[in-house]
């Protein structure tokens, strides 16, 4: 994660130059350091973030509503304007790949590149890249097959749990969190910000929509297209994937 000493007054000057509406809290300090972008949930008063609803501890917050941040930037498109600001002040550092013990990585893998994150600029219709600041965490006993792609997180990390195994051609997108001992057959595609429990099987050529929450002990059949959350202990299959039965026990081998 980038960690720079940018003063609050420098960001405020940028906000004024670009004609944003803003409010300052009673504890505004022009020399307060804002040193990193952050998710709203994890933000502290030294962070810059964005939000569409709810409160945040961020020192600088782009949002569509007034809040208690030291500098609150008011905008109809918080994510887009947050991107414009952090692109100006916080260039991403190279991705760190943090590996546990006994990690095996196949040939021609791409691990730690930026993911496919863009936001449309409503003024001219162009697509603006969301800078990626997160890292990759690979647990113990992770095996990655040939031609895998695992992209770094945007503001948080992409996390692969202990004992995860992937076949060739698997794609796991930014911000995904994969639980322990999950298995991914060839050409499985996991979109961004998926959260998956433990002991799951993802069949060949199947896909999971972004931000889906997949429970533990879930079996996803070959070629399935998962477009919503999946509870624990079920078998899903089809396009779109549907629950077809209870998953009563762990699969014990791959043949």
Report residues per predicted region.
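Structural signal for interior beta-strand "rungs" in well-ordered beta-sheet cores
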Residues: 93-237, 241-244
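Terminal amphipathic alpha-helical/low-complexity segments used for targeting or macromolecular assembly
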Residues: 1-129, 141, 239-255
């Amino acid at each position: 994660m980038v960690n720079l000493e940018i003063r609050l007054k420098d960001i405020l000057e940028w906000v004024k130059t670009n004609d944003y509406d803003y409010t300052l809290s009673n504890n505004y300090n022009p020399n307060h350091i804002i040193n990193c972008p952050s998710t709203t949930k994890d933000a502290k008063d030294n962070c810059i973030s964005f939000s569409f609803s709810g409160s945040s501890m961020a020192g600088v917050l782009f949002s569509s509503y007034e809040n208690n941040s030291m500098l609150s930037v008011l905008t109809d498109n918080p994510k887009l304007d947050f991107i414009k600001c952090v692109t100006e002040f916080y260039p991403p550092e190279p991705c760190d790949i943090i590996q546990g013990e006994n990690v095996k990585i196949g040939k021609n893998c791409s691990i730690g590149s930026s993911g496919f994150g863009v936001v449309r600029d409503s003024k001219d219709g162009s697509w603006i890249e969301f800078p990626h600041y997160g890292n990759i965490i690979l647990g113990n006993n992770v095996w990655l097959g040939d031609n895998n792609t695992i992209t770094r997180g945007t503001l948080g990390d992409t996390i692969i749990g202990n004992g995860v195994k992937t076949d060739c051609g698997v794609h796991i997108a930014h911000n995904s969190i994969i639980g322990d001992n999950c298995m991914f057959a060839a050409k499985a595609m996991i979109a961004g910000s998926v959260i998956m429990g433990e002991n799951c099987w993802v069949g060949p050529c199947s896909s999971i929509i972004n931000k889906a929450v997949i429970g533990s002990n879930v079996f996803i059949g070959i070629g399935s297209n998962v477009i919503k959350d999946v509870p624990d202990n079920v078998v899903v299959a089809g396009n779109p994937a549907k629950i077809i039965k209870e998953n009563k026990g762990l699969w014990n081998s791959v043949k």
